[in-house]
Amino acid sequence: MGSFLRSFRRDVGSSTPSVGATPAKKEPLALPITPLEKMLQEMGSDSVRQDGSDKFFGMENYGNTCYCNSILQCLYYSVPFREAVLNYPTRTPIESLEAALAKNLRYQNFAANQEAEAQAEKQRLANAQRPGAPPAQPPKPEDKDSSEYKKKIALQSLPLLETKNNAGSYGMSESLFTSLKDIFESVVASQSRIGIVRPQHFLDVLRRENEMFRSAMHQDAHEFLNLVLNEVVANVEAEAMKQPIPSLPPADTTDSSRQSISSGSKTPNTTRWVHELFEGTLTSETQCLTCENVSQRDEIFLDLSVDLEQHSSVTSCLRKFSAEEMLCERNKFHCDNCGGLQEAEKRMKIKRLPRILALHLKRFKYTEDLQRLQKLFHRVVYPYHLRLFNTTDDAEDPDRLYELYAVVVHIGGGPYHGHYVSIIKTQDRGWLLFDDEMVEPVDKNYVRNFFGDKPGLACAYVLFYQETTLEAVLKEQEMENMNASAADANEAAVKPNGFPQPAGLAHVHSASQIPVQDEPQRHTGLRRAPTAPQLPTHTEYPGPDIEPSSPAVATPPPVPPIPETANRPLSPKKSDIQSKKERAKEEKERKAAEKEMEKQRRKEQEARVKENQRREEAELKAALEASKASKADEDRRNPTENGKDGDPKRSSNGLSRLKRGSKSFSQRLGKDKESRASSSGLPSVPSAEPLTPNPVPLEPVQQLSPRKASPPKESHVVHKPLGQDDEPDALKSPKGDRAGHGKWRSFSIRKKSFSILS
């Protein structure tokens, strides 16, 4: 393309003679080379692709049509979508396209445009010098680095491609789809690789069929994308209804049918290609909390709109999109199984993944306080490669891998004004910035500038992901590393101050000249990069204009240069990859060590807990044994009166003695009364009958002394120690405690019997 443009410029310069002009005046009118042309020249632009993937045309902005330009560029550089548009219903014959391009493609005369602009400026100044005219403001110098200046130069120098209605050549009636197809076919068939498309015909059809786009107001790019896809589906299905269903070709004519597609003949009227590319299926799962019945409902989508949160990512936004939602109060769910409104849980999952995933970041939110839409400047990180996790269990190809190929950026403070641009990844030329008429190459890291936290009010609004494979990703990374290695090797051959480096020291940089990468994950890798070691602050190789402060020292003869291949500088990217692998390995080992330490710590803690439990159980058992022993000792020393806690045999013996003691005491009283009666001459009183049915032989009871016969104050028996003088007979008695207890019990019964008799 560069050779074509150079020949075109030479023809333009020779065909525009200027009367009385000198060659010196033509120097300022030289056409400046654009960054895109420079990139194409460096990468080799002699071979032109037939599929149109290496055509880079801007689009003219008719007021507020940047929303249309950005979306059309993203759709054009989607290879499957572009091929489907070109092939339905047939490809336009080459002769018809060439005839249309001969009328619609117009090459401009940059020198003539510059001269016309200069004449207009002179006329303006002359009008300002007339008497009575207001003083003219001095013209401001143009900023040649601004996008407005670049767009102006592009409009004056690049070929202009105007599209007309060409629907009759492929047998369709005019519609939004046919106007889109005309743009794609004109760009693909153009012999020029760069230029500017004038989509006036497309905008006319759009405004004719949709009233909302007829005004000059600022429009939403996402709404326009949704409208274009739905209109394309409607136009294609309407056209398919008009045509008869074609019969399937024989199996041996498959190759010939493929050739007929490229030559411009009819293709099978498959109307599902838009659905196969952009359409996905969402499944709404609702579980009733009363009966736990789960109901599912499928929904079709052409793009996913996700809510945003501050300092989040696309993955977290998708996780929130599929989070469970409680349906309660006024939003209760009508359960068919229960037959009424019930509380339920609802969540959204993806059942079928699209081949091209359009993610709409909802940056415009309606606020109740302001009663209008407000733009959200939240930082939302989006990756180059994406895998969706919020899929159903029966999803088709749930592990599909996506790569980012286009970003639509909104620049502005609100939804009602601003500007749209698109950043698109091409097949062989890297990333390009499409800003209406201007097309410029950008670095891959340039895409990271639109997360939402950068100054300038520029935020990513629509993300386009297309399916890819892991092999393609690895191959692309390998190519990027090779290109970066070659570029770094070229830069290392010349010092930044312009002096050539010594041949054997091409890999040495000063401490202030360490190359810094823009990508954040590469900063830590520079510590291990062999291409940039830390050097002392003094200068080892001063330039020719630097005089040493100390006396000159004789230097040895110069060492012969070492071949460059022997000391070829290592690529920073390769060193970065190695350092990343080492860091990943160290991180993995560190995590494994931490995990092992945590596991050991848990084991020690569990062992301490078990030991404490065993010690507590042993202490409790010892306490119980000691309590039992003390209880037995206490029972042995202090037996109870009623015999409940004492020996039952001893208790029964005590009762028998009481019975015997009571009878003997009553008999003795009866005998005394008889003796007194006989002496006094009174009649004898019969003795009381014993209470027990079986009489027990009486035992003689020893006569108690008056001191011992005094009754105790308390009704219960008080046991005194054996060492006291009150019970000398108990120590001498062979029966021990039993005899003693018998005495005291018989004494208490005597007291009671005595009171009864008296």
From Swiss-Prot:
GO terms for molecular function: cysteine-type deubiquitinase activity. Residues 573-631 form a coiled coil. One of its GO terms (cellular component) is cytosol. It catalyses: Thiol-dependent hydrolysis of ester, thioester, amide, peptide and isopeptide bonds formed by the C-terminal Gly of ubiquitin (a 76-residue protein attached to proteins as an intracellular targeting signal). Keywords: Coiled coil, Hydrolase, Protease, Thiol protease, Ubl conjugation pathway. Residues 1-27, 116-148, 243-268, 514-744 are annotated as: Disordered. The active site is at 66 (nucleophile), 419 (proton acceptor). Residues 57-468 form the USP domain. Residues 573-650, 729-740 have a biased composition (Basic and acidic residues). Residues 554-563 have a biased composition (Pro residues). One of its GO terms (biological process) is carbon catabolite repression of transcription. Its EC number is 3.4.19.12. Belongs to the peptidase C19 family. Interacts with creA, creC and qutD. Ubiquitin thioesterase component of the regulatory network controlling carbon source utilization through ubiquitination and deubiquitination involving creA, creB, creC, creD and acrB. Deubiquitinates the creA catabolic repressor and the quinate permease qutD. Also plays a role in response to carbon starvation and the control of extracellular proteases activity. This is Probable ubiquitin carboxyl-terminal hydrolase creB. It comes from Aspergillus niger (strain ATCC MYA-4892 / CBS 513.88 / FGSC A1513). The lineage of its organism: Eukaryota, Fungi, Dikarya, Ascomycota, Pezizomycotina. The gene is creB.
